Amino acid sequence: MQNYTVRPAKSVRGEISVPGDKSISHRSIMFGSIASGVTTVTGFLRGEDALATLEAFRAMGVQIDDDGETVTIQGRGLHGLSEPTDVLDCGNSGTSMRLLTGLLAGQNFFSVLSGDKYLRARPMKRVVGPLAQMGARISGRAGGEKAPLAIQGSKLKGIEYDSPVSSAQVKSAIMLAGLYAGGETVVREPHLSRDHSERMLRAFGAHVETFPGGVKVRGGAELTGRDIVVPGDISSAAFFLVAGLIVPGSDLLIRGVGVNPTRTGIIDVLKGMGGDLELINQRDESGEPVADIRVRHSKLTAMEISGDVVPRAIDEFPAICVAASLAQGTTVVRDAAELRVKETDRISAMADNLKRAGVSIVETPDGMEITGVSSLKGCAADSFGDHRIAMSMMVAGLVAQNETSVSDVECIATSFPGFVNLLEGVVQR
């Protein structure tokens, strides 16, 4: 396990670009593989999670070439995948496993999905359950709750499903199964989750219709390959947004960030806390809104974070916790129980680490209460093998009174392989 030591910063200044969006990178490989014709992907995230998806489709007979600039996919069509000869290894990627479960349920072959010890501990019944209602034959540990998952492809029928959770992974898995199902498949969710699948599937030619509170997919449509430009990942930009806000004297420009409205909860929250964030040069690329974001040091105040904004910021909460730890007053987070079933229990992990840094935090079943302090203490932080915990605590270390060490930082490579170098490149000491 590799530890990393962070020293306090005087400011964070400069211009950067963050790697391509992880959610869009996953989907570009999946949808391009089951489309007819060639799909090219520019800006693909070469992190471990998205590469796990890429390798899974290679294992199912898809020719995918990567010259370092562009990923080129020779699509096999909706029914052109081949039975894999070995277990498909999803690594640490919940997106790979859950979306592949939906896509593979309607194939005419057998497949097995597994992953690392963290992924094998995450809940899969939320996907397996509705897929079983569609006629899928899926078995796994703990009655289908845990991976490895064995999938015997079968004939599927469309269903109407009211999801108890707002999860783009659950929604997307059912939508992908719906491509292979007879009739229409309808998914409703309590709050709108990210809509990259809806946007991209429609661009590929799928019969996808959105309505308030849900999405409808009609099976049988052939997808056609296309060119995709992947914007910068706002979940990766989040660490630099928070760093720019909390480190005095900071002025940072992040270029080419995806600002899909289902993903901009982080911007709404940080602005709500008093953060000086400005979206400039707003534009549209491959059906996704994109902007440059300027962030400057700001005095932050506490707020309540709950309701619709939570699924729009679900992956950014570790970084938000760092901002809240330096905000005046007590920030209350509610409706975020989903954080407990991420790569680790992110509520407990951030509470544990920020307490070590001198912050007063009370955990609740679906969130936490964070009382801000004027400064953080350097500490020995535990990443818990979670990339977002590791990066969040490295950002916290920039404003600690002395050095902060973060354990097991190799996990950062799942989503942001160049994070350390990019951060050190803008930190002024």
From Swiss-Prot:
The keyword Amino-acid biosynthesis applies. It comes from the Bacteria. Its EC number is 2.5.1.19. SUPFAM superfamilies: EPT/RTPC-like. PROSITE patterns: EPSP_SYNTHASE_1 (PS00104), EPSP_SYNTHASE_2 (PS00885). InterPro entries: Enolpyruvate_Tfrase_dom, Enolpyruvate_Tfrase_sf, EPSP_synthase, EPSP_synthase_CS, RNA3'P_cycl/enolpyr_Trfase_a/b. Phosphoenolpyruvate binds at residues 22, 94, 122, 169, 346, 388. Pathway: Metabolic intermediate biosynthesis; chorismate biosynthesis; chorismate from D-erythrose 4-phosphate and phosphoenolpyruvate: step 6/7. CDD domains: EPSP_synthase. It is found in: Cytoplasm. The active site is at residue 315. GO terms for molecular function: 3-phosphoshikimate 1-carboxyvinyltransferase activity. 3-phosphoshikimate binds at residues 22-23, 27, 167, 169, 315, 342. GO terms for biological process: amino acid biosynthetic process; aromatic amino acid family biosynthetic process; chorismate biosynthetic process. GO terms for cellular component: cytoplasm. It catalyses: 3-phosphoshikimate + phosphoenolpyruvate = 5-O-(1-carboxyvinyl)-3-phosphoshikimate + phosphate. The keyword Amino-acid biosynthesis applies. Catalyzes the transfer of the enolpyruvyl moiety of phosphoenolpyruvate (PEP) to the 5-hydroxyl of shikimate-3-phosphate (S3P) to produce enolpyruvyl shikimate-3-phosphate and inorganic phosphate. Belongs to the EPSP synthase family. This is 3-phosphoshikimate 1-carboxyvinyltransferase. It comes from Citrifermentans bemidjiense (strain ATCC BAA-1014 / DSM 16622 / JCM 12645 / Bem). The lineage of its organism: Bacteria, Pseudomonadati, Thermodesulfobacteriota, Desulfuromonadia, Geobacterales. The gene is aroA.
